[in-house]
Amino acid sequence: MNKKIFLIFLGILFYFGRPLYAAEKMTVLLDWFVNPDHGPIIIAQENGYFNEQGLMVEIIAPADPSAPPKLVAAGQADIAISYQPQLHLQIAEGLPLVRIGTLVATPLNCLLVLEDGPVKTLADLKGRKIGFSVAGVEEALLTGMLTPHGIGLDDIELINVNFSLSPAIMSGQVDAVIGAFRNFELNQMDIEGEKGRCFFLEEEGIPAYDELIYVANPERMNIDQIRRFIKATELATQYIINNPLKSWKIFSGTAKELQNELNELAWADTLPRFALRPAAFDKGRYLEFQNFLKNSGLITMKADISKIAIDVSSD
């Protein structure tokens, strides 16, 4: 009888296949408060994909959006959500960081104007006010977009509106804003009764890039843990694409502040932009954007692409 009970017990363990070891802890720092851009991370947590990969992931929203990459570089967290344009600059500054996966595989940034306003083409921006929130990269993006139209930075007035982008344009403080996310600001304006229109960077001469990426410290990272983390987010992305409404309910059910019209609209607009193969990256695309930054004067030397981005699934 004891032998029979023992065999039944072994059968139950085999059937459920649950690991008998403690999950490995990982800390992930977001770039901002939780929002639809982070869908695969939240769904991986809620659907148990991290747990299936033997990971216990702590997800932290930062008090300072600029801090996460620096904290990862200092070894105080395992992974940070960052931006490809910023990664090139951070590496040029000497921070030990490398892209280990992609969250959002297209630009979200755009140059936003009022649909019924005076700006119909980029050439109409000469002599006008343009709001921004992050100096450096956004100035380079503006230069790249405006130069073909015979406009330089001296021909416009740049105004730091912090992160109050859509209010700045709706109030008339500025004529346009750079740094607006097409999946959020356009929807926010629409909800408030103002129609906006985006000039998309990648359609105006700026090389395409990955808006949101996962970065880690190459000197400290556990490549096996990271590989499993990326696998979990890939499973989550597949679930989201296959179940957009169900995944929205799961995502929005994690916090009351997510349950509003803006986030629901942003969720739908963000889904097509999630990286279906988060581990993979296009070496040529990263090289092209690095060349753009060098030509813009934001970096003085080009780094080997293997020092900027890696495919953890191929290691």
Where are these regions (language model features)?
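Secondary-structure end/capping motifs
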Residues: 222-298
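Pocket-lining segment of extracytoplasmic ligand-binding domains
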Residues: 85, 163-254
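Conserved C-terminal helix/tail region of periplasmic/extracytoplasmic solute-binding proteins
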Residues: 287-315
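Periplasmic-binding protein-like
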Residues: 103-113, 194-219, 230, 266-270, ...
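Short, glycine-/small- and polar/acidic-enriched structural segments
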Residues: 25-162, 166-171, 175-183, 198-199, ...
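Bacterial N-terminal signal peptides
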Residues: 7-17
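Positively charged n-region of N-terminal signal peptides that target proteins for export
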Residues: 1-5
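Sec/Tat signal peptide C-region and signal peptidase I cleavage site
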Residues: 18-22
